[in-house]
Amino acid sequence: MKTVLITGCSSGYGLETARYFHSQGWNVVATMRTPSEDVLPRSERLRVVALDVTQPDNIAAALEASGPIDVLVNNAGIGLLGAFEATPMAMAREVFETNTFGVMAMTQAVLPQFRARRSGVVVNVTSSVTLAPMPLVAVYTASKTAIQGFTGSLAHELEAFNVRVKLVEPGYGPNTRFTQNSGKRIEGLIPEAYAPFAQRIFTAFAQSAAVTKESDVAHAVWRAANDSSGQLHFPAGADAMALARPNS
């Protein structure tokens, strides 16, 4: 029976992905900064483990508690919405610590066991902002685009060890806590000069018919984790699929 470790499982895409892998008979290690047992079914095949991907000691402890794993899903991430001109560099660094360096740190930590076994899959969850540039998310886009390039390079680097590396690219999920938290972080990041432009962007998002559901992402992660071909990109959600089509 295979084991998957998924970061960022307290809500949204990570939570649904943990539920889906469990429903498919896998052992699941669901990690979150503040563990909450009641969001997932009670099962001998499911463990909730505390993990902050920005803390090296946390990563080491979580992997020791998890034991050997077959798949790592780097899902944990934070959003940031606002004009770049008004974004403090400290806030930009905070986004990169989780979205970029946290993914790299988790991946680096599991590679020794994958390489030794000559088996394993890393699935990095990025965003459809890497498929088409969007305004007011410059820092967030940069943090995810870095992982896009990192994943592509690493896929070639680890091929000789039979370790696969994949990208899942979700679209806009308006109902996720991730999106709600991004909105909370906007305070002070839309200067008056940007307000009319920002309002048009927010209105367009609110009227978007094609969006991404949590189940879209869970299924895409499942496909990526079980894919034995050389496919790298797995867009998730109707909007992401539409954006990816011109690039396919």
Task: Please give the residue ranges for each predicted region.
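Residue(s) in the substrate-gating loop at a strand-loop-helix junction
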Residues: 127
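SDR active-site lid
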Residues: 160-230
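The beta1-alpha1 cofactor-binding region of Rossmann-like NAD(H)/NADP(H)-dependent oxidoreductases
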Residues: 50-61, 89-90
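A short, exposed helix-loop element centered on a Lys and neighboring polar residues
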Residues: 107-108, 152
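Substrate-binding pocket helix/loop in short-chain dehydrogenase/reductase
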Residues: 83-84, 91-93
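N-terminal Rossmann NAD(P)H-binding glycine-rich loop of SDR-like oxidoreductase domains
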Residues: 10, 14, 18
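Active-site helix of classical SDR
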Residues: 107, 143-146
